[in-house]
């Protein structure tokens, strides 16, 4: 874990349509989006992804949205992300740091995301 990876897959909406862009807008300014990885990356999913994240890989872009969480405001005060998140259904390559989120149900994620590219 904690290595830079590039994963291909399809952006999916696990918000059940609550957000038009298909990603959750976190209070700390981060995105919480979901990638259905291509078969060759299925090994990146763990039990937390399967049980808590609908079998998808989470991706988080830091400081992407307005920050409302007080302790996160200093971190994003001098930085604002301008990554374009492709629409749900887009086949993409996401590059970033591969980690396990141990604060929740121990799912794997790409956090932070460095780059998202639409690919064929």
Model-inferred region functions:
Residues 1-3:
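Short boundary/loop segments of OB/S1/cold-shock single-stranded nucleic-acid-binding domains
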Residues 5-6, 11-120:
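OB-fold single-stranded nucleic acid-binding module
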């Amino acid at each position: 874990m904690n290595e830079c990876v590039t994963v291909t897959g399809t952006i999916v909406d696990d918000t059940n349509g609550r957000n038009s862009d298909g990603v959750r807008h976190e209070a700390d300014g981060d995105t919480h989006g979901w990638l259905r990885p291509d078969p060759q990356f299925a090994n990146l999913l763990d039990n937390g992804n399967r049980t808590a994240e609908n079998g998808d890989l989470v991706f988080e872009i830091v400081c992407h949205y307005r920050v409302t969480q007080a302790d996160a405001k200093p971190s994003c005060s001098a930085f604002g992300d301008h990554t374009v998140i492709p629409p749900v259904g887009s086949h993409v390559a996401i590059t970033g740091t591969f980690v396990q989120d141990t604060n929740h149900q121990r799912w794997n994620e790409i956090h932070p995301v460095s780059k998202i590219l639409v690919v064929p």
